[in-house]
From Swiss-Prot:
Main subcellular localisation: cytoplasm
Binding site for ATP: G14, P15, A16, G17, S18, G19, K20, S21, T22
Alphabetical keyword list: ATP-binding, Cytoplasm, Kinase, Nucleotide-binding, Transferase
GO-annotated molecular function: ATP binding; CMP kinase activity; dCMP kinase activity
Family: Belongs to the cytidylate kinase family. Type 1 subfamily.
Name assigned to this protein: Cytidylate kinase
Length: 224
């Protein structure tokens, strides 16, 4: 049975630190699509769990009582923008932990797919290409060497780039890659119909241009 391709969905996956969120946001802006950072959904989940001292089951039971808006990488809950709060390392770590739970992953999946079915969208995150948007017209796996991703992360944090710092960050990224690849639920993987883009020698703008070009090719028409 031939699957129905959705021409208004672009899915971008890749390892931690590959720049997929930055790229996805810019691609969406260029195309006039919505952008959704799916990782922010899990961070919002954990934020509510932490604030209310809830279990995962309690979160799922109560989440629809909140007025939540996910707009790109901005998250607003009951008219309060909590986006900056979600960047806290504790929230990030907790989000990664609860994302291993099948129940919360299934709940997030329903929210993500409902969002994607309402409007043209570019999404980035784990299992976007394999589970969340399996019929997306374009699936991209964005990658880069662990060392290059470490350098980018060090610069992003405004830290001094030296041998010790580079070694530390590279080791941490390699460990994260191993964990993500070998975990049982939603492991890091390249689906067979994804286009792999290695950004080691490419600027962000070049990666965005390449994805836009690939999208136009898939669409088969000129896209202004």
């Amino acid at each position: 049975m031939t699957k129905q391709i959705n021409s208004q969905q672009i899915a971008i996956d890749g390892p931690a630190g590959s720049g997929k969120s930055t790229v996805a946001k810019l691609v969406a802006q260029r195309l006039g699509f919505d952008y959704l950072s799916t990782g922010k959904i899990f961070r919002a989940f954990y934020y509510l769990i932490k604030e209310n001292n809830w279990s995962i089951d309690q979160l799922i039971s109560n989440f629809n009582k909140y007025e939540c808006a996910f707009n790109g990488d901005q998250v607003v809950i009951n008219k309060e923008n909590i986006s900056q709060l979600l960047n806290d390392p504790t929230i990030s770590k907790g989000a990664s932990e609860i994302a291993q739970d099948p129940k919360i992953r299934a709940y997030a999946l329903s929210l993500q797919q409902d969002y994607a079915n309402k409007k043209p969208v570019v999404m980035d995150g784990r299992d976007i290409t394999s589970v969340v948007l399996p019929n997306a017209i374009l699936k991209v796996f964005l990658t880069a060497s662990a060392q290059q991703r470490a350098i980018r992360r060090i610069k992003q944090l405004n830290l001094e780039l030296n041998k010790a710092t580079l070694e530390q960050f590279t080791n941490e990224i390699q460990q994260r890659d191993d964990n993500d690849t070998n975990r049982k639920l939603a492991p890091l993987m390249i689906v067979k119909d994804a286009i792999v883009i290695d950004s080691d020698q490419l600027s962000i703008e070049q990666v965005v241009d390449k994805i836009i070009s690939l999208y136009k090719q898939r669409l088969g028409v000129n896209y202004a």
